[in-house]
Amino acid sequence: MSLVVRKRSGDVEPFDHAKLAAGIARAASARLESDTVDAVSAELAEALGMRGAEVTSEEVGVAVLERLRELDPIAYLRFSSVYKGFEDLADFEREVDELQRDLAQRDLGGSLQKTTEPKGPRN
C-alpha cells in the first residue's frame, strides 16, 4: 500500500518523496550537504509511512520542522517562514526568540554563553 497525503483542501495525492527532498533542500541551501538532505528526507518518508496509509500535509510539515530544528536553525527558520506563512519581521522575531529559548534549554545555556563572552583579542 502506498502512502498518500491529505492536503488542507481535502484533496488526496500520492506522497512525493522528491517534493519532500526538494523542500528540505531549498530550506537547507548551502547549509546542509546533499547527502544529509537525502538522508533526512528518506528518514522522514519512512517515519511518515509508519503512521499508516495516509498522513496530512500538516503532519509532513511538522515532521520537517522538527527535524530541521534539530539539524540547523537557519534551515529551520527558512522552512518555517514558508510553512507558517510569515507576513512580517515580527513573525521572524517571535520564531527566533522561541528557537533561542529552546536551544538555550537544550544546551543548558550554551548558546547564551556565546553572547556573554568578552569580545576582542585575549591577552
Predicted regions span which residues?
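Long, C-terminal-biased catalytic regions of enzyme "large/alpha" subunits
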Residues: M1-N123
